Regions:
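An acidic, glycine-/histidine-flanked metal-binding catalytic module
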Residues: 2-45, 49-51, 162-252
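Surface-exposed, low-hydrophobicity interaction/linker segments
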Residues: 5, 38-92
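Hydrophobic side chains in well-ordered alpha-helices
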Residues: 59, 117-123
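Short, flexible, solvent-exposed loop/turn segments with mixed acidic/basic and small polar residues
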Residues: 91-102
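Basic nucleic-acid-binding interfaces
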Residues: 97-99, 130-131, 181
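Residue(s) in the substrate-gating loop at a strand-loop-helix junction
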Residues: 109
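Helix N-cap motif at beta-to-alpha junctions
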Residues: 112-116
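Short Gly/Thr-rich strand-loop-strand
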Residues: 124-159, 163
């Protein structure tokens, strides 16, 4: 990837202001920016996004080295958050300062067990402490799952002065996240952001709980788990039904 060029997006203040322009453009509150202001803001944000490419590559390599050092096999991936996704996050979080967004660049390791997850986290954080001379921030959504049922451990670190998010999760936790993404893709309802009918979210939370109790690597054979998976599969196939769930028919 191309080397980072800080001048391409100006200053962090420019990034912050660009984020505010894009927020105002989406929620149509206050002084609505002109089309040229929006285009200019997007150029700044795209340049800032691109500035995370090299730091993300460095984080990805570091994560792979940790896996090698621990003798672990894992599915490892990386991604730069897409511009539409950045804009959507700025819209959903009205106090979000774009210049401090921690997950523009992110990489992930998916492992067999929670024990392996912890080994990777411990080694990664030890290496980061030596490199940055300060501890990484960590959010443990396994000890305290999100309300949605999401489970994983997130490490917030820095490479080349840029914030990078590293997610470490088990295969069961990854399967749950993929189910949510598949539901969102097939139904057009953003379940990941909390949209959609309560019944679906209740099923997802219960599914997350059941998956957390399973022995890693064993196929799902217990009846409650299979029942939830079947119901979610049906909802995914009938996306138009899920989308209108709970909205009523408009009739008395």
């Amino acid at each position: 990837m191309a080397a980072e060029n800080p001048a391409s997006f100006g200053s962090l203040g420019d990034v912050r202001r660009a984020g505010e322009v894009l927020r105002r453009a989406q929620i149509a509150q206050g002084s609505v920016p002109t089309q040229e202001e929006v285009r200019s803001a997007r150029r700044v944000v795209e340049a800032y996004r691109s500035a995370h490419a090299e730091p993300l590559d460095a984080a990805y390599r570091e994560l792979q080295l940790c896996l090698i050092a621990e003798g672990l096999d894992a599915e490892v991936s990386l991604r730069l958050k897409r511009l539409p996704t950045i804009e959507d996050k700025v819209r959903r979080l009205p106090t979000m300062d774009l210049s401090t967004m921690q997950d523009i660049g992110g990489c992930r390791a998916v492992l067999k067990s929670q024990d392996e997850v912890q080994r990777v986290i411990d080694r990664f954080r030890a290496n980061s402490l030596e490199r940055n001379q300060r501890p990484d921030k960590i959010r443990d959504y396994v000890v305290q799952p999100q309300e949605s049922g999401y489970r994983a451990v997130h490490i917030y670190t820095r490479f080349h002065g840029r914030r990078i998010e590293v997610q470490v999760r088990t295969r069961e936790q990854d399967s749950w996240a993929k189910i949510v993404e598949d539901l969102t893709s097939r139904t057009g309802v953003d379940f990941k952001s909390g949209d959609g009918p309560d019944e679906v979210h209740d099923l997802l939370r219960r599914l997350s709980e059941l998956l957390s109790q399973r022995v890693p690597g064993q196929p799902p054979t217990d009846e409650p788990l299979l029942d939830i998976l079947t119901r979610l599969a049906m909802m995914s196939a009938l996306g138009h039904v899920v989308q209108s769930f709970g909205q009523g028919t408009g009739e008395d």
